[in-house]
């Protein structure tokens, strides 16, 4: 008797599966289409043997080329390591690698554009074309405006930390390639408020992604919806059929071990053509201001990403000094 396919195998038939990790061995084992990185994942990768040569090479570069401005040297080594990890991952996945622009640039459009262009150039120098990468940017108004320009230059962007409809619609109107709504962090907020959902279909993170997905499809938007920040396999299963789902290795392993039918929950089949109403900075700001959850989680997410980047840089500074 043939064993039934795992839920992970079934999910791959419904959605593009993305690995939310820089763990080289986990990606080899789980075979996602895309993967995504951030400073925390890069910092963890520094402890993995597969990256040992990369780390030593870039630290040696830092020691050789570092001038009097130690901070600039550390920051450059951090960028080189980030791209180096991305290059290794690009060898493994058939699709894209998302690479995050510094979170402390989240409210600076021009600096975000400059950093994105730098990352694309660094990848190109290492033999990775821009069609293999996504530039990950926090979905502030300034970040979305940066993505609008980058998309015009053929640089595809992943707008992250999406918690609110205004953010999602502004990204779609700007022609952003992909957005990452954060399912788990939305749930976390409401659970902390004592509002635990009675069922997965009432999970506010799941409801938000379903709403955005359906509205995008109804409006004929080409912007990809990639659910992110999952707390359980139940949340993932509730979004089966979403364009893409970025999932941590532990939840991918659980899905690979589970069997039973995994029905499609989202489908563009009933989509109707419609047009987006342009969102300006004032309507964007008012939409966020009216949503305490999104306001808190966007600011908190940027702060967490910035702290993670500073932690990566501190680790590099310590290694350079050692």
From Swiss-Prot:
UniProt pathway annotation: Carbohydrate degradation; pentose phosphate pathway; D-glyceraldehyde 3-phosphate and beta-D-fructose 6-phosphate from D-ribose 5-phosphate and D-xylulose 5-phosphate (non-oxidative stage): step 2/3
Cell compartments where the protein resides: Cytoplasm
GO annotations of cellular component type: cytosol
Top-tier EC class: transferase
InterPro entries named in the record: Aldolase_TIM, TAL/FSA, Transaldolase_1, Transaldolase_AS
Active-site residue list: 136
Catalysed conversion reaction: D-sedoheptulose 7-phosphate + D-glyceraldehyde 3-phosphate = D-erythrose 4-phosphate + beta-D-fructose 6-phosphate
Keywords: Cytoplasm, Pentose shunt, Schiff base, Transferase
GO molecular function: transaldolase activity
EC number of this enzyme: 2.2.1.2
Biological process according to GO: carbohydrate metabolic process; pentose-phosphate shunt
Top-level division of the source organism's lineage: Bacteria
Entries under CDD domains matching the protein: Transaldolase_TalAB (cd00957)
Disulfide bond positions: none
Subunit structure: Homodimer.
PANTHER family, per database record: TRANSALDOLASE
Described purpose of this protein according to its UniProt entry: Transaldolase is important for the balance of metabolites in the pentose-phosphate pathway.
Family label: Belongs to the transaldolase family. Type 1 subfamily.
Identification of the protein by name: Transaldolase
Organism for this UniProt entry: Xanthomonas euvesicatoria pv. vesicatoria (strain 85-10)
